[in-house]
Structures are given as structure tokens and as C-alpha cells.
Amino acid sequence: QCEPYLTTDYVYGAEQCEYAFLAIPYLLKASGAKRVFFCTKKDKPALIDACEKWRKKYSSLPVELVLAKDAYPRGYERNLVTLVTGKEYEHIPIEAGCIVDNIYTYIALGRYFTQGKSADRRCVTVSGEVAKPMNILAPYGVLAEDVLSLAGFKAEDDLKIVNGGPRNGNVLSDGHYVLLQQADG
């Protein structure tokens, strides 16, 4: 996760990490890949502990955990490919022999492959000048204002609503924005 104020990947990843591991056999078969690298920042102990726990349980899977120093924008896929392989590429990661996915994608696929459940919700970070900053697991289609209200946001507070983070986010005119799969904070 390259956005500095979003924590959805770390929180949801730590809580649902086993599903990511359950997706790996399917993804290895579909992609022809020989191994998987889980990369996270060194300052995310809950996610690191979860990855180590499930890596031990599923020790037959070719998974390596790569810990990166906290450097913005560490989640940027070019940085990850270079960190893990030492290679660079011009257009897309496959040029360096890599497929880069977010842990959220692995979790969603793990839930689908093992339980037949499609991705129908998204964990979003609500932070900034709200009364109760938090991560919220919300169904797709809910209005942003409903999610924001859980964190104590009030329209009259005259705060900016940013969909995403400062790097890739966009300012919304109001909370009448429908939560979609791409939203994460």
C-alpha cells in the first residue's frame, strides 16, 4: 500500500491472511509462477505475524516474506519488483518476470476458491479530522457518507473528502459517492 494514510491492506491483510494463502495454489497454476513473494513494510507487525503464521501452516507453498523499510511510495509496483528481483522494466511487471497483486486481491480470490464467495465488500480507511478514525468493512454500493458517518464525519464539518490517499486520490464534492471495488480510503 503506497498511500501513507491508508491502512486497509495491513489491517484486512492481517485479519484475513489465511485466504491469501489459500489462493496461492490456484494462482501458481494459472500463472505458471514458481514462487510467491509477500512484501510488506517492516513496521507492520500484525501483518508480518499473520504472514509468518500462515506461511508455517502452509509450508509446502513456495512463499517468501520480504520486509521493506518504510519508504514512500513503497507499495508502488516498480519499487516492489526492483526490491524483490533487482530487475527493472519499461512498461509492465511481466517484462521482469513478475505479476504484482495486492493482498486484497489474493484474499478475495481465496474466499472465492474456497467458499464460492465473490468480492462483495471493501475495507476502507477513514482517517484525518474525523472523531473516530477507523477501518470499516463496507459492502459495495453503500454511500461514502454512510461509511464516513460511522467514523463521526458530519457534512457540516466542512472537511474535504478524499477518495484514496494524497498520491492517487481525488477530492469528492460530497458524500454521495458509491463505494466501489477500487475504493480503499
For every predicted segment, state its role:
Residues 19-23, 50, 146:
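Long, highly charged amphipathic alpha-helices
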Residues 153-157, 166-185:
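Ubiquitin system architectures
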Residues 14-30:
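Histidine-anchored nucleotide/phosphate-binding helix
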Residues 1-9, 130:
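Gly-rich Lys/Arg/Thr-decorated short loops/hinges at beta-loop-alpha junctions or inter-strand turns
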Residues 162:
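Alpha-helical ds-nucleic-acid-binding substructure associated with the helix-hairpin-helix region
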